[in-house]
Regions:
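Bacterial Sec-dependent N-terminal signal peptides
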Residues: 1-42, 343
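Alpha-helical and His/Cys-centered functional microenvironments
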Residues: 8, 49, 170, 174
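N-terminal, motif-rich segments that launch catalysis or mediate targeting to/interaction with membranes
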Residues: 31-161, 177-269, 273-287, 291, ...
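Extended, hydrophobic/aromatic-rich amphipathic alpha-helical segments that build helical scaffolds
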Residues: 160-168
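Catalytic Zn2+-binding segment of zinc metalloproteases
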Residues: 167-181
């Protein structure tokens, strides 16, 4: 049955959702965290998942709002799994520049469908250079199955996870082998773009991104996010390099108190100059990630037959799931990283 033939979702309550609700969620006190390798930083990933809840129609909103703290806190679990699981790291990126030469269009060269890409490059090659668009498609199918089973644990786990991968796909530096500027003398740009700029400026962004919409072609949606990110990559690198020429080293970097330690970081002045010259890019990519996350949750639910989630409300995550998450957190803090690090 096509989406158009499904019953229309009642949006009236959604439309009555006042701006006050979103302002309340933005007043949530986020601890400033610097992850070792997380796209958007832990701060950004949590905010993306949290605000995505407010894009949902009434049929999903009640359930997701009830579990908004879980979805927020566990938005970073996929990055933690990079410390615990082989095969996780490549789910977070795709090095498009390994597939094309200057002047070529990677999006006409790389097949979008997994089987066609495997036939052209081999699975080992794809895994080596990252699989994020295909993994988003896999995660959507897992979430859809969780809705079909009406399994609260799996709905929550896969909702949090897919939000993370979608967030990663909206980051330009997750589409290149030069993911941390290490090939162009710009080491550290990864954390600058996705963490430092967000932590300084996120409270000034406009998060009224509209309502979640059904995604007709999930794989194409994932690829479109990657394409938009990659199209911005040249500006990310070029503008930082140009700006560096205007700042003496002692003006580009500074030291800040982080907990009990004093750590080096990009200065506030350099960060703000970079953010300004990017001309809203970080905010645009974050807004696009938020609406895509909400739309993907909605799409998985629709494709599962629109199960009545009100029947699942007041059902907390199981102790088994919470124990699994605590074990993952312990492995993360123990810290044997499996995959690339962006410091």
């Amino acid at each position: 049955m096509s989406f158009q033939s499904l019953k229309m979702v009642n949006w009236l309550n959604y439309k009555r959702l006042s701006g006050l609700s979103l302002l309340i969620v933005l007043s949530f006190s986020y601890p400033v965290e610097h992850s070792k390798d997380a796209a958007w930083g832990f701060y950004g990933h949590k905010r993306i998942n949290r605000i995505a809840v407010f894009t949902l129609p009434p049929a999903l909103f009640g359930f997701y709002k009830e579990h908004i703290e879980f979805l927020t806190e566990h938005a970073v679990d996929p990055d933690k799994r990079r410390y615990a699981m082989d095969g996780e790291a490549q789910c977070h990126y795709i090095d498009l520049d390994r597939y094309y030469s200057s002047g070529e269009d990677p999006f006409t060269i790389i097949p979008r469908k997994w089987n066609e890409a495997v036939a052209k490059y081999t699975e080992d090659t794809l895994q080596k250079h990252g699989i994020i668009p295909w993994h988003i498609n896999v995660m959507k199918m897992r979430l859809q199955k969780a809705f079909e089973l009406q399994n609260v644990d799996l709905i929550l786990k896969y909702s949090a996870d897919i939000g993370h991968y979608i967030g990663d796909a909206h980051v330009p530096l997750h589409t290149t082998e030069n993911y941390n500027g290490q090939l162009t003398g710009q080491k550290g740009i990864h954390g600058l773009w996705e963490s430092r700029l967000v932590e300084i400026n996120a409270d000034d962004y406009n998060y009224f991104v509209g309502k979640a919409a059904y995604i007709e072609h999930v794989l194409d949606c994932a690829w479109d996010a990657v394409k938009a990110s990659h199209m911005a990559l040249d500006s990310v690198l070029r503008i930082e390099k140009e700006l560096t020429k205007e700042f003496l080293p002692d003006k580009k970097y500074s030291y800040e108190q982080r907990g009990n330690a004093v750590v080096p970081t990009y200065s506030f002045e350099f960060s703000q100059a970079y953010h300004q010259r990017l001309n809203g890019m970080v905010e645009r990519r974050m807004r696009a990630a938020i609406i895509t996350v909400g739309s993907m949750w909605f799409t998985a639910w629709v494709d599962a037959g629109q199960p009545d989630l009100s029947r699942l409300q007041n059902t907390p995550p199981s102790q088994a799931l919470l124990e699994e998450m605590r074990a993952l957190d312990a492995q993360y803090h123990a810290g044997c990283h499996l995959g690339r690090i962006c410091e």
